[in-house]
């Protein structure tokens, strides 16, 4: 199903704000070089899936961000001016790993020929 322009705009806003909050305001040592790769907003605007990539210590970084989700949601409520701020769900983005694995498989097939 195609997303409406307003949902895409809201996803973009959330992505920018969460990225700024995580990189500039969270001071946990386990959060090392985080990148918000994607944000998916549910159709009822009640839940947000936030996909993150870390340069190292992915699980520790994800746990630290999950622990700070209340703070992040509070900061979003102050900046978004929405009637209801969505609940945040954080996940590690596996796309880069999958792409690297596929690239290795293709290179090994190329070398076999």
Swiss-Prot record:
- MF annotations from Gene Ontology: ribosomal small subunit binding
Cited PROSITE patterns: RBFA
InterPro entries according to UniProt:
KH_dom-like_a/b (IPR015946), RbfA (IPR000238), RbfA_dom_sf (IPR023799), Ribosome-bd_factorA_CS (IPR020053)
Which superkingdom is the protein from? Answer: Bacteria
One Pfam family it belongs to: RBFA
Keywords linked to the UniProt accession? Cytoplasm, Ribosome biogenesis
Q: Give the record's GO CC terms.
A: cytosol
Q: Name one GO biological process term.
A: maturation of SSU-rRNA
Subcellular location per the Swiss-Prot or TrEMBL entry: Cytoplasm
Which residues, if any, are the signal sequence? none
> Which regions form coiled coils?
none
PANTHER family, per the entry: RIBOSOME-BINDING FACTOR A, CHLOROPLASTIC-RELATED (PTHR33515:SF1)
Protein role: One of several proteins that assist in the late maturation steps of the functional core of the 30S ribosomal subunit. Associates with free 30S ribosomal subunits (but not with 30S subunits that are part of 70S ribosomes or polysomes). Required for efficient processing of 16S rRNA. May interact with the 5'-terminal helix region of 16S rRNA.
Q: Oligomeric state and partners?
A: Monomer. Binds 30S ribosomal subunits, but not 50S ribosomal subunits or 70S ribosomes.
Family classification: Belongs to the RbfA family.
- Return the protein name: Ribosome-binding factor A
